[in-house]
């Protein structure tokens, strides 16, 4: 590994309590802002193609099946990259690993705007998926390193809103730019923004607290649950930690299976929602994308409620809140599907409620994976469940396009409603577990 990409060594420990407190407060705030901004732009360059899809479809460059194929290719590549990058990021310098990944996705988005053939689109979008995997595992590692167990839900939820801000803005920006200059210019604008923010990441981000002379966060906050996780698995090699706390951890596997189904719903609404609005209500691209943006707005609020609730109502136990939100997904998807009349306002409201409930488990499952694993394997654990999440998301691409061709929108909503129902059942074992990892170890 290039020397600047290696995780920095521990710096001499600062002994002055006031300086430790001041540095912790400063860097916790700045790191959260930086990873939030960075991940919003990762999401911006991830969803740029989806936002432009109706315009590309109308131009005749790609068919509906082609768009579904590209979505499936992206999700599979991204899922694999997320897992591999999670393992690598646990040993890498966070600031450069995440920053370089974002710059690379920006370059790929710009090149996509110059492309004309399906093969070029497929190659570039797979390459974009690969570099997209550099983002989320780094964020999970930093959130685990800088925020302790009993407060992490709220902070993780704040970071998670970057998904929603990026996801809500890109349809609006893409639609506005495409309306005046074409979808190709929209892809280039997204790419240029990503390159600029990627440079900011390389400048402002930092690695774990020990790298700048601070004690571990559990010691600083006197958080017993956090200290217990910090001390667990002492003396194990990285390979042993990966095997014991990730690959052979039954709770990680259960969370992974649930993530598959949650992401079927999330990706289906995200990727096909604007087309559904265009075809069923006959609205234009800007109006359709505005409704899809309500999905992200609902997710913004839902993630905050889920994180706050799991901290304050259930003392850091993610299980009960996960189950409540999974049941809400089923109800909101059913409302969107079975609405007895065509109303743009009501459809947009259903997009909002679906987003509200989807982004609870979307955020909490990743956090639960980090907390069910080892402190030094947070990136690998979230990357592993992320692999399964995007295998689920890949089902919303080409396979769901085929469902649409045969059974139309009725089949589409039946599939995602079933996925929502099963996901709720898979979360039942976590309902009464304060710390599934500790139960497993006992």
From Swiss-Prot:
The chain crosses the membrane at residues 31-51, 67-87, 96-118, 122-144, 163-183, 185-205, 245-265, 290-310, 323-343, 348-368, 380-400, 411-431. GO terms for cellular component: plasma membrane. It is a multi-pass membrane protein. GO terms for biological process: glucose-6-phosphate transport; phosphate ion transmembrane transport. Residues 1-30, 88-95, 145-162, 206-244, 311-322, 369-379, 432-442 are cytoplasmic. Belongs to the major facilitator superfamily. Organophosphate:Pi antiporter (OPA) (TC 2.A.1.4) family. This is Membrane sensor protein UhpC. It comes from Salmonella typhimurium (strain LT2 / SGSC1412 / ATCC 700720). The gene is uhpC.
């Amino acid at each position: 590994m290039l020397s600047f990409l290696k995780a920095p060594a521990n710096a001499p420990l600062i002994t002055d309590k006031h300086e430790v407190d001041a540095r912790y407060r400063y860097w916790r705030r700045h790191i959260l802002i930086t990873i939030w901004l960075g991940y919003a732009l990762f999401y911006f360059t991830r969803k740029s193609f989806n936002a432009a899809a109706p315009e590309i479809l109308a131009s005749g460059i790609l068919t509906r099946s082609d768009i579904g194929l590209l979505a499936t290719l992206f999700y599979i590549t991204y899922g694999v990259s997320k897992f591999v990058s999670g393992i690598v990021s646990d040993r890498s310098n966070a600031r450069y690993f995440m920053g370089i990944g974002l710059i690379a996705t920006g370059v790929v988005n710009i090149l996509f705007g110059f492309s004309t053939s399906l093969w070029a689109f497929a190659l570039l979008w797979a390459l974009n998926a690969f570099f997209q995997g550099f983002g989320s595992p780094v964020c999970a590692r930093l959130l685990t390193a800088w925020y302790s167990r009993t407060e992490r839900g709220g902070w993780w939820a704040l970071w998670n809103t970057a998904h929603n801000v990026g996801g809500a803005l890109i349809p609006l920006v893409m639609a506005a730019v495409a309306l005046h200059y074409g979808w190709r210019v929209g892809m280039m604008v997204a790419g240029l923004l990503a390159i600029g923010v990627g440079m900011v990441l390389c400048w402002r981000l930092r690695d774990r607290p020990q790298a700048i002379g601070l004690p571990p966060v559990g010691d600083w906050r006197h958080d017993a649950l956090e200290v217990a996780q910090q001390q667990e698995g002492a003396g194990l090699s990285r390979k042993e930690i990966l095997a014991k706390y990730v690959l052979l951890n039954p709770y990680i596997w259960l969370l992974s299976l649930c993530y598959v189904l949650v992401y079927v719903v999330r990706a289906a609404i995200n990727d096909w929602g604007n087309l559904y609005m265009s075809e069923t209500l006959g609205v234009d691209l800007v109006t359709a994308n505005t409704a899809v943006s309500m999905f992200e707005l609902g997710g913004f609020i839902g993630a905050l409620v889920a994180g706050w609730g799991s901290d304050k109502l259930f003392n850091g136990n993610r299980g009960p809140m996960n189950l409540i939100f999974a049941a809400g997904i089923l109800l909101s998807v059913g409302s969107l599907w079975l609405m007895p009349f065509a109303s743009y306002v009501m459809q947009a409201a259903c997009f909002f409620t679906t987003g509200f409930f989807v982004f609870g488990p979307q955020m909490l499952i990743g956090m639960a994976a980090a907390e069910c694993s080892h402190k030094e394997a947070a990136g690998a654990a979230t990357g592993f469940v992320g692999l399964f999440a995007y295998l689920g998301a890949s089902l919303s691409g080409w396979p769901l396009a085929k469902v649409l061709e045969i059974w139309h929108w009725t089949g589409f909503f039946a599939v995602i409603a079933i996925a929502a129902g099963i996901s709720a059942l898979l979360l039942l074992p976590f309902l009464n577990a304060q710390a599934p990892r500790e139960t497993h170890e006992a």
